[in-house]
């Protein structure tokens, strides 16, 4: 097979404050993969951006590992492949870079192993590997999605929510924050009353989004009790960014995923001025407007 598989895979932001490990939204920053068979004796990698050049090129490569895991599950053998990669999703910043790579790996195994997975099956596989659907679901489908993974039945359920009519700003620090380190900051247990309170806030926030009530949704996004209070101290710039966003009447300022990126829901009439203020005042970060992605992963076959 000499055909080339081309994948364009969006970034994602998870949690939206109170939707811990459940809610995610796709963003227009992308991992681009171009994959074809090689006559070599092992998988080959060509990286076109500096961040990707940090990645391993042996069997510990994440895409290789996941693709082989999927191939093994369906009892198929994959040929040796050459993967060209370019990404504008920063690594370990809370923008779903690992979820994008995971989804890409499943698509690679599916095509070159001729597995014929449905998109529903891709979601089930991705969530089983990832452990929760908050990043992988919007990466696959696009848009804003709430989901739940039942780790007993191994079944994932998702619900699509209307795209918010807001401008999205991401403030990206220069440093990484590994998900594992961010999760270590979380408590092992919450009291029953704490869990009930946070669940009620999350439920109401989702309803507010569905009703396009961004004032209420934003207010509730900032009242999380599951993870934000335990992670904010890991992000030195969080309080300053939130203060500046509030001065520009933003709807909400929350941690994107496990951090350190900070996500802002902004009023459209204020977003440009807000981004410029953030870039002039919070010089240790880069802030930018980013569109909500509505397409999810895109697959294209180039026949040769």
UniProtKB/Swiss-Prot annotation:
Enzyme Commission (EC) number: 2.7.1.39
Pathway membership: Amino-acid biosynthesis; L-threonine biosynthesis; L-threonine from L-aspartate: step 4/5
GO MF annotation list: ATP binding; homoserine kinase activity
NCBIfam families, alphabetized: thrB (TIGR00191)
Designated gene of the protein: thrB
InterPro entries xrefs: GHMP_kinase_C_dom (IPR013750), GHMP_kinase_C_sf (IPR036554), GHMP_kinase_N_dom (IPR006204), GHMP_knse_ATP-bd_CS (IPR006203), Homoserine_kinase (IPR000870), Ribosomal_Su5_D2-typ_SF (IPR020568), Ribsml_uS5_D2-typ_fold_subgr (IPR014721)
One Gene Ontology cellular component annotation held by this UniProt entry: cytoplasm
Single GO biological process annotation from the record: threonine biosynthetic process
Name this polypeptide is given: Homoserine kinase
């Amino acid at each position: 097979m000499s055909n080339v598989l081309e994948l364009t895979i969006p970034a994602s932001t998870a949690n939206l404050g109170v939707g811990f490990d459940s809610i995610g939204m796709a963003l227009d920053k992308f991992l681009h993969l171009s994959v074809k068979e090689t006559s070599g004796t092992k998988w080959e990698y060509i990286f076109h951006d500096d961040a990707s050049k940090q990645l391993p090129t042996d069997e510990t490569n994440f895409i290789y590992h996941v693709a082989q895991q999927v191939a093994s599950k369906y009892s198929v053998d994959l040929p040796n492949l050459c993967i060209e990669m370019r990404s504008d999703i920063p690594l370990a910043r809370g923008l779903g870079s690992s979820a994008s790579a995971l989804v890409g790996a499943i698509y690679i195994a599916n095509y070159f192993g001729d597995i014929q997975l449905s998109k529903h099956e891709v979601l089930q596989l991705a969530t089983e590997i990832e452990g929760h659907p908050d990043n992988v679901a919007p990466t696959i489908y696009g848009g804003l999605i709430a989901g739940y993974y039942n780790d007993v039945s191994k079944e994932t359920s998702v619900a699509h929510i209307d795209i918010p009519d807001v401008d999205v700003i991401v403030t990206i620090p220069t440093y990484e924050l590994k998900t594992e380190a961010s999760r270590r900051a979380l408590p092992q247990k919450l009291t029953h009353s704490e869990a009930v309170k946070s669940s009620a806030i999350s439920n109401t926030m989702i309803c507010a989004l569905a009703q396009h009530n961004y004032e209420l949704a934003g207010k509730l996004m900032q009242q999380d009790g599951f993870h934000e209070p335990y992670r904010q101290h890991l992000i030195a710039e969080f309080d300053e960014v939130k203060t500046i966003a509030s001065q520009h009447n933003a709807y909400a300022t929350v941690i994107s995923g496990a951090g350190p990126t900070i996500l802002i829901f902004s009023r459209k009439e204020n977003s440009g001025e807000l981004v410029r203020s953030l870039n002039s005042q919070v010089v240790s970060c880069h802030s930018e407007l980013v569109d909500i992605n509505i397409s999810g992963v895109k697959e294209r076959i180039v026949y040769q």
